Amino acid sequence: MNKKQRDAKNKKRFQQQNPLFKRKKFCRFTVAGVEQIDYKDLDTLKDFIGENGKITPARLTGTRSHYQRQLDTAIKRARFLALMPYTDQHKH
């Protein structure tokens, strides 16, 4: 193993152990080549909803603004059509 490979391996190990390490954000939709986000794709939409039912902002998810607007619209449509809940599961 040469020095370059060893340094890369040590860097990766340090990043995994460091609790303050932040992974570089990227847009999932750009990587996948998605053109339009569909309101019927509930599995994808649920990934962008927080525990309390709020839409997660792009600065936290890394989603590009073009796709974030489509994502917001798709989530709102799914909520309006009762495909998704507006809030989390309340227990009275």
From Swiss-Prot:
Similarity remark: Belongs to the bacterial ribosomal protein bS18 family.
Role noted for this protein: Binds as a heterodimer with protein bS6 to the central domain of the 16S rRNA, where it helps stabilize the platform of the 30S subunit.
Superkingdom: Bacteria
GO molecular function (one): small ribosomal subunit rRNA binding
UniProt record, GO biological process: translation
GO CC entries: cytosolic small ribosomal subunit
Keyword terms of this UniProt record: Ribonucleoprotein, Ribosomal protein, RNA-binding, rRNA-binding
Residue intervals passing through the bilayer: none
Name under which the protein is recorded: Small ribosomal subunit protein bS18
NCBIfam families reported in the protein's UniProt record: S18
Organism: Ralstonia nicotianae (strain ATCC BAA-1114 / GMI1000) (Ralstonia solanacearum)
Record-linked Pfam families: Ribosomal_S18
Alphabetized InterPro entries for the sequence: Ribosomal_bS18 (IPR001648), Ribosomal_bS18_CS (IPR018275), Ribosomal_bS18_sf (IPR036870)
Subunit description: Part of the 30S ribosomal subunit. Forms a tight heterodimer with protein bS6.
